Amino acid sequence: MPALSLIALLSLVSTAFARQWEVHPPQQQGRHWAQICSGNPFNRIRGCDRYGCGNYGASRQGKGEKHKGVDVICTDGSIVYAPFSGQLSGPIRFFHNGNAIDDGVQISGSGYCVKLVCIHPIRYHGQIQKGQQLGRMLPMQKVFPGIVSHIHVENCDQSDPTHLLRPIPDISPPFPQQDAHWAVVCAGNPTNEIRGCDKYGCGYFGAPRRNGKGEKHKGVDVICADGATVYAPFSGELSGPVKFFHNGNAIDDGVQIRGSGFCVKLLCIHPIRYNGRISKGQVLGRMLPMQRVFPGIISHIHVENCDRSDPTSNLERGKGESEMEV
């Protein structure tokens, strides 16, 4: 969808939302909400992409309007949790055109009132507890290819919810390391979740590659938002650069780590250096802008063992075990 069409829809949304406001309790200060989306333990807010920016008050082109909520990064299909305990009401329609993400719900309670949009809740009415599963993220890439998929989070009084979401800079691995498995590879993906399937293919080891040669995927694709911090999965010696495409595109970079009984190549990242020692969990670099090269793909780090064996078991970090409130 062209950016101008999105802008027009957002303008309609703001008008429609304004008509729905009732008297709500003031938003409390000094408290924090729970994790909203699995895979985003710090409620990281969307930056800027070709459709706009996700921060509160960001400019909305066309009518001089401002963004009245914040966009919390959430991969399509991810589990969504209740940020606080309260009463559900809905459905909440954002676009009023029946598209694939035109759904949402309101939660009112605990001194707060918020609308979470572009999700499909498990129900629209009744009580819900803080941290309880609320629903699933809808397929935003189907509607806006290449956007940073996100939940639109808007206080009912249109005040700024940013301080309640407590975004924290990615300065350290989000979870303690365990010797049995590799560390967290990408900030915002604490379980090293592997890319599923999109229009470009699938991310699991051995997935077919559509190149006409019957080849299989020789690594796994660990989900990682463009620009996210990347960590060393284990301690070892760096070497590189490692080029994947050999065409100089925006993601043609990477590095190899050898040590601790492992050898792996991490591609589509820009490392802080190509040589020297690195420790498990230490900052390794940044995810490169994959959306710029493959619009609409699930952005990811290509992780490939040097001997081309399957690294999946090393990456597993107990899905579902630490994805509630942090």
From Swiss-Prot:
Domain of life: Eukaryota
GO terms, molecular function: metal ion binding
Modification note: Substrate for arginine-specific ADP-ribosyltransferase.
Gene3D superfamilies named in the record: Glucose Permease (Domain IIA)
Disulphides: 37-74, 48-53, 113-156
Keywords recorded for this protein, A-Z: Disulfide bond, Metal-binding, Repeat, Signal, Zinc
GO cellular component, as recorded: cytolytic granule; extracellular space
Cellular localization per UniProt: Cytoplasmic granule
Start and stop residues of the Sequence repeats: 28-162, 177-312
Signal is among the record's keywords: yes
One of the GO biological process terms: granulocyte differentiation
Signal peptide per UniProt: 1-18
Chain positions covered by the region annotation Disordered: 307-326
Binding site for Zn(2+): 67, 71, 152
Induction description: By the Myb oncogene.
UniProt family annotation: Belongs to the LECT2/MIM-1 family.
Descriptive protein name: Myeloid protein 1
Primary gene name: MIM1
